[in-house]
Amino acid sequence: NMLAHLEDGALNGDTLTPDRKHLLEAQRNRAHSPEMPMHLGPQFVYQWQSNQNAAMSAMPNLQSRLSSLSHISLNLDHPEGRSGSASGSAANLAGSNTHASSVREYRCEYCGKQFGMSWNLKTHLRVHTGEKPFACRLCVAMFKQKAHLLKHLCSVHRNVITTTNGADTENRYSCCFCSMCFESVQELVRHLSGHHNNLLLTKNL
């Protein structure tokens, strides 16, 4: 090439001193020799190390940014799943709150006890007020609950509601308000609760 030609001309010229020719020839041989290591100046080595250290220090930040971008891309791949799960969780939470409020929405103003049905609260309030709306028409007994009155009729006044069926020894249970008879106490209780429910209340005495 041209550089080699110029170097040959410079070496063959008469203007160079023998020492200068020897130095140029040694440099040319070193440049073309594959086994000779390349020597870098200290300023170039320091600059190269500084650039390498800066690149290595920036590597963790780059990796963290790449990981965050991959997380975002994964979420964007399934937007309907993410929104669906969020809406599902919100719906479940709202449903549980609604269920809890519907189960315990009646509170006693005296003790704070809660009930799921209004009639349960109404029955409970009689514990505080002392109200006894159910009365026995065969005596002066009064009760807070209708079940207690029916139990009273079938136990205290059992001889009144129990009759003997002719020659048979089987007992039949007659209604104290009408002439109907029943084969069991349970049937009589259902009859009293249905047909004569108003007659069991004290306000109708």
UniProtKB/Swiss-Prot annotation:
**Subcellular localization, per the record?**
Nucleus
Q: Listed GO cellular component terms?
A: nucleus
Q: Which residues form the signal peptide?
A: none
Question: Would you say which domain of life the source belongs to?
Answer: Eukaryota
- Predominant location category: nucleus
**Is-annotated flag, keyword Repeat?**
yes
Alphabetized, the UniProt keywords read: DNA-binding, Metal-binding, Nucleus, Repeat, Transcription, Transcription regulation, Zinc, Zinc-finger
Q: Which GO terms describe its biological process?
A: female analia development; female genitalia development; male analia development; male genitalia development; negative regulation of receptor signaling pathway via JAK-STAT; regulation of transcription by RNA polymerase II
Task: Please name the InterPro entries in this protein's record.
Answer: Dev/Hematopoietic_TF, Znf_C2H2_sf, Znf_C2H2_type
Identify one Pfam family in the record. Answer: zf-C2H2
Q: Does the keyword Iron apply?
A: no
Output the Gene Ontology terms for molecular function: DNA-binding transcription factor activity; RNA polymerase II cis-regulatory region sequence-specific DNA binding; zinc ion binding
Zinc fingers (C2H2-type), renumbered ranges: 106-128, 134-157, 173-196
Function text: Probable transcription factor, which is required for terminalia development.
Descriptive protein name: Probable transcription factor Ken
**Can you name the source organism?**
Drosophila yakuba
Q: Gene behind this chain?
A: ken
